[in-house]
Amino acid sequence: MLQQTQVATVVPYYRRFMERFPDVRALAAAPVDEVLHLWSGLGYYARARNLHRAALRILDEHGGELPESFDALAALPGIGRSTAGAILALARGQRFPILDGNARRVLSRYFGVVGSSAESSVARRLWELSERSTPHDRVDEYTQAIMDLGATVCVRRRPLCSRCPLAEKCIARRTGRQHELPAPRLARARHRRRVFMVVALRDDGSVLLERRPESGVWGGLWCLPEFSSATAAGAFVRGNLGEAAVEPRTLGQLEHAFTHFDLSITPLVVRCRGAARAVEEGVSLWYNVRAPSRIGLPAPITAFLSRLADESLFDAARV
């Protein structure tokens, strides 16, 4: 959960997640939709899917016990070199280097490493430094300490050098380059993406949802059918809902900001009359907004469907 996400954001999600899934067996036994439901709002949903896949593998291949070897651990979905090293260092006291974002920042500044870690040569250098710096004793304490140092003192903006125990020998501080190191990755040009989503309503208060592809935005989550144009959305309505629906009409505008782009969503509302599209298991479903089930939904879609659950708005949308 902490990958690419701040601690303050993670804590309430972590508590709910651990209450529902106290061990690997509970996680493996749960449907992936419930896992995604509890992850909804954290983003980077591949993390949740990989966590569930890893739990299944641990149960099937390792008898429900976390592997103790680096190679077996790193072979699990979603666990790379740094995560495997951190798990073994913290949980088993085994000596393995780590290179998460916090450790990378500390090492880059302390040793004065120039260049972006996205460059393979720089990444290799940082791994070498991490290996060299990892002690043979009390490795669990060191691993936690370097992560905490990067998270609370050697922060990305306005590092607190006066409080840093490594300040005296830190090359970045001695040369006044704390704000230059580590070198940032090249920023992507921010853009706006516009889409149309069909809100197909039935009289029983349910809305048609489709599962999104696992790759891409909101991977694996359930969402309103999405289209790049109103024309394509209209063709979907005529081809899939046919005589069962009136012509779509708009219902406000939704805006959502991602890390590198902004998403504008135009909801096109149709009322399904009489017969309606049959769903394909695992691909589409009718979701009752008044009695929501525990499935993975993108945060802005959850908010929108909650608005639909309001009686007056739901009735207005169906007129």
Predicted regions and their residues:
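Intrinsically disordered, low-complexity regions enriched for glutamine and histidine
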Residues: 1-2, 258
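Intrinsically disordered, low-complexity, charged terminal extensions of DNA damage-control enzymes
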Residues: 151-319
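Catalytic cores of DNA base-excision repair glycosylases
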Residues: 2-179, 242
